[in-house]
Amino acid sequence: MTATSGGLVAVHAHPDDESLTTGALLATWAASGRPVTVVTCTRGERGEVIGERLAHLEGDGPALAAHRDRELGRALAALGVRDRGYLDTIRGSVDQRFEDSGMEWVGTGRAGRPDEIPPGAFVGVGLEEAAERLARVLRSRRPEVVVTYEPDGGYGHPDHVRTHEVTQWAVDFARSRADDASPAFDVPVVLWSVQGRLALQRGMRALGGDAVLAALGGLRDDLELPDPTAELPSVAVPDDEIELEVDVLPVRTRVLDALRAHRTQVQAVRAIDDDSALVGCYALSNRILAPVLPTETYRRGTGGSGDVAWPDGVRPVA
């Protein structure tokens, strides 16, 4: 990572999360000419792999990590982001690699910790150690905004939950401590990525409509539709809790190109033009279609002490 000042710092658990959850914000911020930094906590070594061509990577941690790093580079280039790094490459008190902790499905759309935590797993890293590394980034970049997940990590993945915890601790450490290179810094705004429940359910219902079927070339046996009446993941919040919106359509091409870059993780990426409930769709390795909503939404997190002048395409909800 290279030194900058101001701007946006996004903190994510694995390669692909930056595009799936904050792609429009990153692309909009970068297009405004403001600096953007993406910090990724692990390399996704234990992720599933989509498709036969790359199936040999699944279970081969080092090979999958190297491949996903290349995917991340292409995705960030599509979003216009140049400054990026892994949390374990930032100087800390110990020399330690932070690895994907893995997960187990514990319900529909809900992840939890695996029965056995593998050696080097991110969830096993000391919280203060990881947070102080990130705090170094915040002090050196001095961003206007820090963005990460809500407290349950969007859907309960242990690395996402840990990333939220590390980010919140780092914001506090950056404010209360200096380091040998930078003075203390109080982050003005902390954002958590969320989705309004009603908007998400509308988008899920629209996935069964004619516009999506046309974009996919008809019904596909390898994909499933979500159940909008099922229990929603923790990323879904009451619509009146949304505090910030990002218009997706002006940067949709960049966001979809970023999703396509993550070929081991994301499939069936399509633009949708004829339905007001969504502007695109995709599926992960679970083969369940998901909507790209017209707006990417956020709520204010804890720790921020001020406000910023938002770029065009980003607006607070009155």
Regions found by a protein language model. Give the residues of each.
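Active-site rim/loop-helix segments in enzyme catalytic domains that contact anionic ligands
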Residues: M1-R141, W169-F173, R177, I288, ...
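Metal-dependent de-N-acetylase/amidase catalytic core
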Residues: M1-V11, G112-A318
